[in-house]
Amino acid sequence: MGIPDLSSGTQTFSSDSEKAECLNNYFCSVFTKEDQNFLPLPKTAHPRMSNITVTCHGVLKLLEGINGKKSSGPDEISPRILKEVRVEIAPILTFIFNQSLQQGCLPTDWLTANVFALHKKGSKTSPENYRPISLTSVCCKILEHIIYSAVSRFLEDNNIITPRQHGFRSGYSCETQLILAINDWSHSFDLGHRTDVAIFDFSKAFDKVPHKRLLAKLAYYGIAGNAFNWIGAFLHNRTQRVVLNGSKSAWSSVDSGVPQGTVLGPLLFLVYVNDIVSDIKSEIRLFADDCILYREIKSTVDSQILQDDINSLFSWSKLWQMEFNVSKCHIMSLSRSKKHVNAIYKLGNAALSAVHSFTYLGVEITCDLRWNNHVATVVKKASNTLNFVRRNLYRCNGHVKELSYISLVRPLLEYATAAWDPYTSCNIKDIEMVQRRAARYVKRDYQRTTSVTSLLDSLHWQSLQDRRRNARLLHFFKALHGYQGLSQLVNDLPRPTRLTRSSCVDVVAFSQLPCRTDVFKFSFLPRTVIDWNSLDTGVRGLSSLESFRQALVGGRSAATSY
């Protein structure tokens, strides 16, 4: 489906060329006009990054990994062609890449982008509801990968990126961020304390990053030498045009932002927002531009501290020219008591609106930390998708039907389930019902006398409840073995005794956590500790993630007959 007629003010745009021009004008209108009276950052105390040298072997490896089906950029150099002639072209690209790094300049074609408009949500007739995705030169992206690898390794090795940031980082994910936040909230809930959560929404965050301020932060964090010079050239003199069904808008200059769709864009954004956590006394959690701030409220002093932290975020946004969308910023109180008086918090001069639920990283959080609403939403979405698949693939064989369920329906039921794994029988039953309907569809058996359990067994499908348990245990295993996202969460667990092996981490059971409420009892940590303790010592002692995964599955990989 294409983009319908667009409306901007009193004007309506119908033809593809008009719509492309309208979208491009809107995308350019949100760029930041940077304040040149910039207060420099203090002299850096971070080590300086060394120069990058590109090797032919590294370029060849990246060329081998190219997805030949991806689109080319404005230079129209096909990724499929690059992959096919990789052996011949790798030495040439290596020379060009090293020259580009040494001279700190890029070919003009590398600074252009064909922009495609991706609908987010809301009315499709409004340009404001589209996100610009840049298609750039594939050759440039290969060099971006090399620079990304070097810069991200430097930042991680020197512990520069805050551990509160879980976006675009190896070992971190939406799920790890959700697990940590919900663990904090449910534990406070268990103790009878109220937690006030402030939810912030940046307006066009990736498009508004001012370039000079970004370069100043890169220098402050130690990004130096040819990488720094190259990134500066990468951001300077960029142009873009919107492409829609073959129609193209006029070229426009890109005055701010990190281009969405590039390799370096997400990493540059992480660097830019990294110091937002400075001087914050409450708990702050980031996933790229998603930001929440929360604190246990035991007295008015805590409310004032949270307000001071909100003020700090507002001051940061003004200094670094990043705007909050105040109408989408909210406050929510998590509490066992229904009689507490909500405090009033302000972002600048605007009071934050109080809500009883909000969606964080794709999961609906309610003020009582129950999962009824989220389960209902997930089940409805998965059921609608299953119905769509059934209507369109009813003539296909069982193998195709099974693949359609596994790839299109089940992921909707299992997104981030380690964080919100439901425990009430009604929620568990509602989720399992979708899979039971899918089993009948795959097996083409709708007879009332047929046991659905036998159909599930013949398909070798684990129950979704068991799969959620395994997902939690896998996260727990990763945390024990030093994967970044959750390592601190399990490091603080009490261990009654200590049994060690030379080749792996501890295999001892952990002490169970005291719980007063079901909300905390069935949250990730207390629940998974019990599940971990129930595993055989031999399974707990495995050092390989894949071996541990296979042990949990328990040999359910047999072929299915249809």
Residue ranges of predicted features:
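A glycine-rich beta-turn/hairpin centered on an aromatic-Pro dipeptide
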Residues: 332-338, 435, 456-508
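Conserved pre-catalytic core of RNA-dependent polymerases
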Residues: 20, 27, 45, 49-259, ...
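Basic, alpha-helical interaction scaffolds
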Residues: 281, 350-419
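Catalytic palm active-site di-aspartate
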Residues: 73, 112-115, 131, 165, ...
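Short, conserved micro-motifs composed of acidic
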Residues: 49, 246, 308, 323-357
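Active-site palm subdomain of RNA-directed nucleic acid polymerases
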Residues: 147-165, 190, 266-295, 396
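Surface-exposed loop/turn segments and immediately adjacent short secondary-structure elements
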Residues: 1-129, 134, 142, 248, ...
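Catalytic palm subdomain of template-directed nucleic-acid polymerases
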Residues: 83, 204-221, 291-315, 336, ...
